[in-house]
Design a protein with these regions (language model features):
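Catalytic histidine-centered segment of alpha/beta-hydrolase-like enzymes
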Residues: 292-303
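Acidic catalytic loop of the alpha/beta-hydrolase fold
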Residues: 264-269, 294-295
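Hydrolase active-site cap/lid region
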Residues: 190-237, 288
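Short alpha-helix in the alpha/beta-hydrolase fold that links the catalytic acid
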Residues: 256, 270-279
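Cap/lid segment of the alpha/beta-hydrolase catalytic domain
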Residues: 98-155
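N-terminal targeting or regulatory segments adjacent to alpha/beta-hydrolase or S9 domains
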Residues: 1-68, 323-325
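Alpha/beta-hydrolase active-site loop
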Residues: 145-171
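Short beta-strand/loop motif that positions the catalytic acidic residue
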Residues: 254, 260-262
């Protein structure tokens, strides 16, 4: 895609995002920075121990489980997800967990379900998770998300990914992989720095740290939002000195099992960030796509390419058996 069109799509999305209530709440929450930094630098951000989730199925596909990291809001303490089993003997196959972007209802509700048939053909089950404070887990009565609440939400999201991973492995799945886009890629990256049970990960245009162009307010036309974001530069710089910044940690799985996807025309998460993590993570495979943060989804054959990359890494034996079921 030509750069001007890709960037116009991103710019338009940025204007819409600036008006979304949950985004505005995050922008207004410039408090509890000291507590957030202490939490992120402490052992409770991503604890060593992770217990398997206790899934309860509401239908053949939809499930819930109690979050392993509780907060004061009942709505956010219940994790919602979907499991798309490949076959009746689904436990014999790897599972790919799909993680959506921030306030990214379209990917979660439309793109991910559309990917399921291809994932099944690749010999895998598919699962999705709703990130903290998103969709069914939204909390309207919060006036502002301060820095501590945002930090805790990141820790909660990682804990929930690890809990679902534990449940899948306990069920007998030979391996678990992650595909995360934007915010989901950031959460997948954090999980990959702490959980060696993960077999392979794909970080598609991931967030890497708190301080980037969109959080500076660059390109936002709505003046009140832009000014609020501009005032938080020092806070973001402080947060970027903690393990929330992916470039300050190393993954615990081999770099051969990590795939980075970059949008060369990305206006929301600039490509320099993926280059930075590519270098600090010892140069795993990276695909530099001629697209923006949103238009990369239009790349012809991208799902097939990703699944062709993932399939042999998740479990070669299970993949070789896929044609028999």
């Amino acid at each position: 895609m030509i750069a001007p069109l890709a960037q116009f799509i991103d710019w338009s999305a940025l204007q819409v995002a600036a008006m979304i209530p949950s985004i505005r709440k995050c922008a207004r929450g410039d408090s509890k920075l000291t507590e957030a930094v202490e939490f992120l630098n402490g052992p409770n951000f991503i604890p060593a121990e992770s217990k398997p989730a206790a899934l309860e199925f509401k239908s053949k596909i939809h499930f819930t489980f109690p979050s392993p990291r509780l907060c004061e809001f009942v709505e956010n303490n219940i994790v919602h997800g979907r499991l798309y089993r490949r076959a009746k003997d689904w436990r014999k196959f790897p599972t790919l967990i799909l993680l959506h972007g921030g306030v990214d209802f379209v990917t979660h509700r439309c793109r991910f379900p559309a990917m399921v048939p291809a994932i099944h053909r690749a010999g895998c089950n598919a699962a999705t998770l709703v990130a903290p404070y998103h969709f069914q887990r939204g909390v309207r009565r919060v006036e502002a998300f301060d820095h501590l609440r945002v930090a805790e939400a990141f820790g909660q999201g990682v804990a929930e990914i690890r809990a679902l991973t534990g449940w899948l492995l306990n069920q007998g799945c030979p391996s678990v992989g992650l595909f995360g886009y934007s915010l989901g890629g950031w959460l997948a990256g954090l999980a990959a720095t702490s959980d060696a049970r993960l077999k392979a990960i794909v970080l598609a245009l991931p967030g890497v740290r708190r301080n980037y162009r969109a959080t500076h307010g660059e390109g936002i036309l709505w003046t009140p939002m832009r000014k609020v974001l501009e005032k938080q530069t020092a806070a973001r710089e402080a947060l970027d000195k903690t393990p929330l910044n992916l470039t300050l940690s190393q993954p615990v799985l081999p770099k051969e099992n990590i795939l980075l996807m970059q949008g060369r025309y990305d206006l929301l998460v600039e490509p320099e960030l993926s280059e930075e993590i590519w270098q600090t993570w010892k140069q795993p495979e990276i695909w530099r796509l001629p697209h923006g943060h949103l238009s990369w989804m239009l790349t012809r054959g991208i799902n097939r390419r990703v699944l062709d990359w993932l399939a042999p890494r998740l479990d070669p034996q299970a993949i070789s058996e896929k044609g028999t079921h």
